[in-house]
């Protein structure tokens, strides 16, 4: 880590102790100072996202689901770290990941070199995915398949489908047509895979599109479409995450068939026990180095690839580079704090709450409580901020961030409710996924193309680390309490969360389309002769 810190210091020219400030150092100082007002704005957004979740959990803890002081204190400290982490990450992604992706995407399109686009696209998808921290967790859940085999296969799947996404945008291939083909292949393969691996396979699609990969991949799409001048360019600026989510699902399903895997394993999170405030801080500080290393490993491939592009083709000015460098530091700090708080503070609390609620006689309360938590928790997903902002910018405000957030919240709320039904009843996940995807793909042929692309991107974005570190442990804890099968009944929450936004966002688009048609039909037809009669003579002559 000391080497990584030294490289950042040298790249940003942050003065070492005893050093003197140069022009570049003053530039970095100006950039940092100019970002402080934005940090305050992001802090308010983070508070609005996390405080409702904290309030719901506190109400449960002080009423029907009592927890130990250790779990409660860990949860509260974790919530504070998540708030600060979201604040830094959202600003950092705006300053670094988004402009980096847009410039690389534009450069690839301008080159008009198909082999370069295919090669770089695959390499980007492969390297970004192989360093995704959540992929390591997924690999440990499938012990019958060697970890490195699974990781390399999933990364290759993302790389291949990122190339397909690029080619789709350049060739103008409709997204619904590709979705029909790929999801038909997925459900065909699912018929030959052991049921123990179905949920894990579908979860992999949401797990691998994490907060590190989503902002960069989405920005690549905007950069590629920005070079096109046709009227469908804005529609095709989304859809990269949608196709990248298909690759991991296919990879895990194929590996499940090849390796004849028969079962998966589940290791419940360790319930923390702390005696005082020093032990509480020690618990978090011991986990901090793990996430410092993980996020550094995740950021490094993106930084290296961008550095190569900068030297070879981009040649961005010094001020913009300084802003990107400061943004990368913010992104790094934000993700480290976020993942530390989520994994050490939220995960044990979610698991224990699930056990307490599932162990009560009125266990049906899991369904409405899960829906309430799901409605608010998606607002705390780091990548959701990036998606909502990008949607608002690309559509020139036609789809506001608030409208997009409401559609995502409704979708995730529904998905968590259905996931809790699965936990309580043991219904196969295919009974939900097949009708859900069939409906989502069917309406994609009548909904405006832009909404379809946004919807399928939103599915990968909504199923982020908050789902994996709180909603999934909540379902696992409840499954333990009711005596269910963890692997078949609890896993699959991520897949459910990734599916329902496809429906809610497209329905939002359908409603908007119907309103537009109704407004146009309600407008009275104007008589040209009457309009001319109302104009003064000078205006008619000018016309």
Model-based region annotation:
Residues 1-25, 165-180, 196, 228-273, ...:
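Juxtamembrane and boundary regions of transmembrane helices in multi-pass small-molecule transporters
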Residues 1-9, 49-64, 78-88, 120-127, ...:
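Hydrophobic core segments of alpha-helical transmembrane domains in multi-pass membrane transport
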Residues 2-46, 50, 101-115, 229-237, ...:
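Intrinsically disordered, low-complexity non-transmembrane regions of multi-pass membrane transporters
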Residues 40-46, 67-77, 109, 142-151, ...:
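Interfacial loop-to-helix junctions that mark the boundaries of transmembrane helices
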Residues 41-49, 73-79, 107-115, 175-180, ...:
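Alpha-helical transmembrane segments and their helix-start/interface "positive-inside/aromatic belt" motifs
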Residues 59-73, 93-102, 127-142, 161-173, ...:
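Transmembrane helix-loop junctions in multi-pass membrane proteins
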Residues 72-77, 270-383:
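Transmembrane helical segments that form the transport core of multi-pass membrane transport proteins
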Residues 105-107, 114-185, 363-444:
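Helix-loop-helix junctions within the multi-pass membrane cores of secondary transporters/permeases
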């Amino acid at each position: 880590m000391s080497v990584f810190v030294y490289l950042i210091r040298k790249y940003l020219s942050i003065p070492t102790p005893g050093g003197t400030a140069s022009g570049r150092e003053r530039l970095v100082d100006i950039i940092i100072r100019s970002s402080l007002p934005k940090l305050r704005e992001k802090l308010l957004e983070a508070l609005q996202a996390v405080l409702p979740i904290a309030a719901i959990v506190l109400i449960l803890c002080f009423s029907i689901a009592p927890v130990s002081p250790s779990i409660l204190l860990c949860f509260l400290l974790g919530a504070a770290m998540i708030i600060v982490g979201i604040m830094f990450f959202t600003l950092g992604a705006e300053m670094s990941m988004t402009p980096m992706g847009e410039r690389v995407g534009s450069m690839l399109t301008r080159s008009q070199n198909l082999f370069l686009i295919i090669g770089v696209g695959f390499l980007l998808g492969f390297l970004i995915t192989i360093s995704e921290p959540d992929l390591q967790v997924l690999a440990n859940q499938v012990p019958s398949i060697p970890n490195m085999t699974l990781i390399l296969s999933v990364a290759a799947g993302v790389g291949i489908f990122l190339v397909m996404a690029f080619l789709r945008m350049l060739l103008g291939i409709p997204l619904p047509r590709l979705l029909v083909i790929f999801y038909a292949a997925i459900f065909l393969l699912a018929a030959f895979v052991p049921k123990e691996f179905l949920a894990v396979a579908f979860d992999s699609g949401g797990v691998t599109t994490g907060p590190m990969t989503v902002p960069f991949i989405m920005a690549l799409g905007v950069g590629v479409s920005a070079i096109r001048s046709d009227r469908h360019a804005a529609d095709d600026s989304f859809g990269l995450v949608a196709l990248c989510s298909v690759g991991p699902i296919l990879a895990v399903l194929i590996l499940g068939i090849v390796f004849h895997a028969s079962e998966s394993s589940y290791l419940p999170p360790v319930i923390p026990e702390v005696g005082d405030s020093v032990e509480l801080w020690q618990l978090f500080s011991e986990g901090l180095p793990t996430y410092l290393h993980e996020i550094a490993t995740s950021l490094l491939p993106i930084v290296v690839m961008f550095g190569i592009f900068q030297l070879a083709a981009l040649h961005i000015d010094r001020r913009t580079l300084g802003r990107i460098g400061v943004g990368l530091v913010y992104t790094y700090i934000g993700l480290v704090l976020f993942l530390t708080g989520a994994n050490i503070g939220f995960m044990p609390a979610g698991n224990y709450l699930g056990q307490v609620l599932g162990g009560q006689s009125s266990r049906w309360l899991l369904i409405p409580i899960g829906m309430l938590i799901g409605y608010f928790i998606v607002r705390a997903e780091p990548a959701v901020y990036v998606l909502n902002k990008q949607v608002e910018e690309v559509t020139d405000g036609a789809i506001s961030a608030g409208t997009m957030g409401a559609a995502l919240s409704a979708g995730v709320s529904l998905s968590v409710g259905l996931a809790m039904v699965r936990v309580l009843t043991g219904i196969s996940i295919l009974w939900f996924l097949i009708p859900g995807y069939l409906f989502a793909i069917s309406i994609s042929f009548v909904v405006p193309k832009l909404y379809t692309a946004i919807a399928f991107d939103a599915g990968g974005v909504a199923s982020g680390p908050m789902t994996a570190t709180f909603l999934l442990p909540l379902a696992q804890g409840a499954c333990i309490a009711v005596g269910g099968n963890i692997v078949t009944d609890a896993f699959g929450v991520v897949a459910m969360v990734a599916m329902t936004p496809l429906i809610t966002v497209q329905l939002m688009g359908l409603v908007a389309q119907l309103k537009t048609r109704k407004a146009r039909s309600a407008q009275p037809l104007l008589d040209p002769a009457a309009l001319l009669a109302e104009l003064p003579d000078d205006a008619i002559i000018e016309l």
